[in-house]
Amino acid sequence: MLRQKYDFEMFPVSALEKVRGNVRPQLFEAENTAFVGERFAFQVAYRSIGVLRSDLAYRLEGAPEENVWVYLVREVPCGYPVAEGSDDYVLEAAPCMMPDLLMPVSPSGITAKSGMWQAFYIVAEGLPAGEYTFRFAVLDREGRTIAETDYRLRVLGKKLPDADL
C-alpha cells in the first residue's frame, strides 16, 4: 500500500540504497525474508515537493515496539570518495555529502527539505517467526497522515548457523 499527498513522496527501499539528496532512490523494496534471530533493516525514502516541511512526525505499526528501532539517515562530508586507479563503479567521483550517519529519532520534530531525498532507516531484531506488515506513516503537525507505505517481512522459523569469523 502506498498513499501520499501530491506534495510529498515516500516509498520503501533496500537498506543498501544510498538515499542522496537530488538522486531518486532506485532500489525499491516492499518485502523481504529474514531468519529468526537475524537483525534486518530497510529504509523509507521521502521528500517534500516544493515546500520545506518541519515539525513532522512518524508512526510505525506492525511489530512489537521493543523489537523495532527507527533512525534518520544524515549526510556527512565525503572529501575523498575515489582513490586513484579505482574502477568506474562509484556513486560520486568528487567530494560531496553522502548519507552515512544513523541518528536516533523521536517520533516528532522531523524536517523534510524541499526537493531533497532523505530516509528513515528501520531495524527489526528479535522477531518471532511469522509474517509482519510494517505500516510507516508521516504525519503533519496536526496529526494528519501526509504519506503512508507498507513493508512486508517474513521471518522464517529457522536460525542461521553461528559464524566462525
Q: What annotation goes with each model-predicted range?
A:
Residues 145-165:
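An acidic-aromatic substrate-binding cleft motif
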Residues 47-52, 63, 127, 141-143:
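Short solvent-exposed strand-capping/beta-turn motif centered on an Asx-Ser/Thr pair
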Residues 118-127:
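Short, hydrophobic beta-strand segments
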Residues 113, 126-134:
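Short glycine/proline/serine/threonine-rich loop/turn segments at secondary-structure transition edges
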Residues 1-26, 50-118:
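Surface-exposed binding patches on compact interaction domains or structured appendages
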Residues 27-53:
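Contiguous beta-strand segments within globular domains
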